[in-house]
Design a protein with these regions (language model features):
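Carbohydrate transferase catalytic cores enriched for Leloir-type hexosyltransferases
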Residues: 1-389
């Protein structure tokens, strides 16, 4: 096949989406397909400008300069070229290739739902609502979709004006080599690298400051667990620097001296952190997929996560489930969820080994090779099917 992948521009500084696009491109190239990646380049956005104006200059690169480049490039593309949008948020470009074989990968519709007022925890301003409407007008013209979870696929169908010609679900494959390590050795090495007191064990969260990551809930849960447990393991939060709200919550925590933020950790260190953690906390309010659940399980770490889709799709029966944190009543929620955390903390060696083994077995569902094989078969079917254009 000849495949063109549309990807987010590098100048936006995204991390997970460029990795996903690269995994697709590398995977299809390794399978013998001819691959190209098209993405806007910085021209207007390279100009010196204050922050808000710089964002609008980026829009010029994405929605004025880039479409003109695409129209020129299309003339040289064979008629059987498959055009793949690596994220439905690239929807404004979909009309450029409508009528030709195409596919749209869908990760989560949280921004779309927020723009329609469906998520009170994440209100969206007027310009944000217009931007999401522009995205929706684009991707709803597509006919073939691949979602990362059944939950995402269900949201997609709500937003489409009519049923799509094709809608498949393919779970994400892990795009790094996650695997178990000796936990004690991992902790000692991590403590040496970071200078933090992690050698005797720790609880872990990996994620950014997005509202749905519920980092404030992680702090609440940790404090509630410490209040009832004889264990004094610290909490390690890997991701962005804490925002103002999280800094304020941290400042009033009675266990703040045992809460450590690790900013911009490299991939190798994250893998080591998973392998050494006693328990991985992932109380997200929502997700498109929930990569860290599979990453932690593949690393041999028991996972506590929310009893809501798609977290339940990823964790399956191998996770320890807690209720979703309500908009109010976080203290009561944390006290209840802390009992589940303590249940894991109290496991004996044999029971913990069983929990770890269940997670490792579950994580086998999320190999990159399996995901890429499924995606390749879908791509080939789209190219073979005239009505899929």
């Amino acid at each position: 096949m000849n495949i063109v992948f549309f990807a987010h521009p590098a100048f936006l500084g995204h991390q997970s989406m460029p990795r996903f696009a690269q995994m697709l491109a590398d995977g299809m190239a390794a399978r013998g397909h001819t691959v190209a990646v098209w993405a806007p380049e910085a021209a207007f956005s390279r100009l010196s400008a204050p922050g808000p104006l710089r964002k609008w200059l980026g829009y010029l690169d994405q929605y004025a300069a880039f479409p003109a480049q695409v129209r020129r490039r299309l003339r040289a593309c064979p008629s059987d070229t498959l055009f793949v949008f690596t994220d439905h948020a690239l929807g404004p470009w979909v009309p450029l290739v409508v009528g030709r074989p195409h596919a749209v990968h869908c990760h989560d519709f949280l921004a779309q739902r927020s723009a329609l007022g469906e998520i009170p925890e994440n209100p969206t301003g007027w310009t944000g609502r217009q931007y999401q409407a522009l995205i929706r007008r684009g991707y709803t013209q597509a006919r073939n979709f691949i979602s990362v979870s059944r939950s995402t696929a269900a949201d997609l169908q709500r937003f489409l004006p009519a049923p799509s010609v094709r809608s498949d679900v393919v779970y994400n494959g892990l795009n790094q080599a996650f695997g178990p390590q000796d936990p004690g050795a991992a902790r000692v090495q991590l403590a040496a690298k970071t200078g933090l007191p992690l050698a005797d064990g720790y609880l872990l969260h990996v994620g950014g400051n997005q509202w749905y990551k519920n980092r404030r809930g992680v702090l609440e849960l940790y404090s509630a667990w410490r209040a009832l447990s004889a264990h004094t393991w610290p909490l390690l939060l890997i991701g962005q620097a804490p925002d103002a709200a999280l800094v304020a919550d941290h400042a009033i925590s009675p266990y703040r001296a045992d809460v450590h933020f690790l900013i911009q950790a490299d991939d190798a260190l994250v893998r080591q952190a998973y392998a050494g953690a006693q328990i991985f906390l992932f109380p997200s309010l929502a997700e498109g997929f929930g990569w860290p659940i599979a990453e932690a399980m593949a690393s041999g770490c028991p996972v506590v996560t929310t009893a809501e889709a798609p977290m339940t799709e990823v964790a399956d029966t191998a996770g320890f489930l807690i209720p979703c944190r309500p908009a109010t009543g976080g203290t009561a929620w944390a006290a209840d969820a802390a009992r589940t955390v303590e249940q894991i903390a109290a496991l004996g060696p044999e029971a913990r080994a069983q929990a770890v083994a269940a997670g490792l077995a579950n994580a086998q569902r999320f190999t990159a090779a399996h995901s890429l094989a499924q995606i390749e078969a879908i791509y080939q079917d789209i190219v073979r099917t005239p009505t899929a254009a």
